[in-house]
Amino acid sequence: MQVSGIDHVNILTDDLEKTASFYERLLGLTRAENPAVRMGIAGYWMCDAEGNPIVHLVDRLSAPGRYDEYRPGEVTNAVHHVALRCEGFDDTVARLKEMACEYRVNDLQHLGLRQIFLADPNAVNLELNFKGD
């Protein structure tokens, strides 16, 4: 077996609509039906411009018993952050300001890389990487 990349990130939330709106407004992802909805679990797949579901959102409260031990917003222990390849640095900064989100910029000129660090509504740490942008 050989791993070719990360397929998606799954995020549990107690506020599905707020979280989906955050990923739509900031990252330009679009909502798609989550096939698990048929199993009674509410959620969305947040897709990139090519239709790839890269962030899965699950309403933790719609699945009693299944996710009871997980608490959005609490420390995630070993998983520190999720890094995403992005385009449109200036537009992203403008959207962050418009959304009144706290963020930090790291400019690694020697690597041709600019980064934005922030947290989503569930305290998931995000690293947005802009290469040559």
Question: Can you say where each PLM-predicted feature lies in the sequence?
Answer:
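N-terminal beta-strand motif that seeds the catalytic metal site of vicinal oxygen chelate
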Residues: 1-17, 79-82, 132-133
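Core segments of cupin and vicinal oxygen chelate
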Residues: 12-54, 106
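Exposed loop/turn and edge beta-strand positions of beta-sandwich/beta-sheet ligand-binding modules
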Residues: 5, 40, 78, 112
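Vicinal oxygen chelate
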Residues: 1-2, 34, 93-133
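A short, acidic/glycine-rich surface segment
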Residues: 40-42, 64-69
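Conserved beta-strand in the GNAT
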Residues: 55-58, 127
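Mid-chain, well-packed structural core segment of small domains
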Residues: 75, 81-89
